[in-house]
UniProtKB/Swiss-Prot annotation:
Keyword Iron-sulfur: no
Subunit annotation: Component of the mitochondrial ribosome small subunit (28S) which comprises a 12S rRNA and about 30 distinct proteins. Interacts with Aurora-A.
Nucleotidyltransferase is among the record's keywords: no
Pfam families registered for this protein in UniProt: COX24_C
Function: May act as a negative regulator of Aurora-A kinase, by down-regulation through proteasome-dependent degradation.
Tissues/organs with expression: Ubiquitously expressed and especially highly expressed in heart, skeletal muscle and testis.
Gene Ontology terms: cellular component: anaphase-promoting complex; mitochondrial inner membrane; mitochondrial matrix; mitochondrial small ribosomal subunit; mitochondrion; nucleoplasm; nucleus
Record protein name field: Small ribosomal subunit protein mS38
Cross-referenced PANTHER family: AURORA KINASE A-INTERACTING PROTEIN (PTHR32035), SMALL RIBOSOMAL SUBUNIT PROTEIN MS38 (PTHR32035:SF3)
Regions annotated as coiled coil: none
Entry keyword set: Mitochondrion, Nucleus, Ribonucleoprotein, Ribosomal protein
Principal subcellular localisation of the protein: mitochondrion
Organism name: Mus musculus (Mouse)
Length: 200
């Protein structure tokens, strides 16, 4: 209601000035062009008049595109906030009632579990240095296992060569013992045991 009265008063004050400016003839050529509208509201031809929509259709289209409840001008919003909404009393201090908190009873065994976790953490303190040491040890072991797998045939060949050398040395020691005992040759049906070359 208040907004309707205010807008009607503003329209009354603005309309006479608009009529005066339109009715006042301009002096000279410059004045006539100053108050002459740059466009014409009347259609130029009957075909153009038939193509243009009516005022009712245009207003319905505007209401459909921009509803009146959503289209609020800044003036209307300011007037609504200034006169219709209740004002806040600054002098009266606002006191907020403290909310009541209720402590729920603990569950059975929860305190014991928490105590056990605390004791475990206290017994085995975890440090960044210890974690890095463990990770480095695991990585070194992993690299060593990969190296062993990659060089297993080469190491087998080296090991077999060492065993052959040990077997030859063992046979030489046996021959030296025979000669020292007074035997020129080994006894009949004697086979030198293959101690180091078990698979051969």
């Amino acid at each position: 209601m208040f907004l309707a009265r205010l807008t009607s008063r503003l329209a009354r004050t603005v309309v006479p000035w608009a009529g005066f400016s339109r009715s006042c003839p301009g002096s000279g050529v410059i004045g006539s062009y100053a108050f002459r509208p740059l466009y014409s509201l009347q259609p130029a031809s009957p075909s153009r008049a038939a193509s243009l929509p009516g005022k009712r259709t245009q207003s319905e289209l505007e209401e459909f595109l921009v509803p009146r409840k959503m289209a609020i001008s800044p003036l209307e919003s300011w007037l609504t906030a200034q006169y219709l909404l209740p004002r806040r009393n600054v002098e009266v201090p606002v006191t907020l009632a403290p909310s009541q908190f209720y402590e729920c009873p603990p569950r059975q065994g929860e305190e014991e579990a928490q105590q056990g976790v605390r004791e475990a953490w206290d017994a085995t303190p975890v440090q960044c240095k210890n974690v890095l040491k463990i990770r480095r040890r695991k990585m070194n072991h992993h690299k060593y296992r990969k190296l062993v797998k990659r060089t297993r045939f080469l190491r087998r060949k080296v090991r077999e060569g060492r065993l052959k050398k040990k077997q030859i040395k063992f046979e030489k020691d046996l021959k030296r013992i025979w000669l020292k005992a007074g035997l020129k040759e080994a006894p009949e049906n004697w086979q030198t045991p293959k101690i180091y070359l078990k698979n051969k």
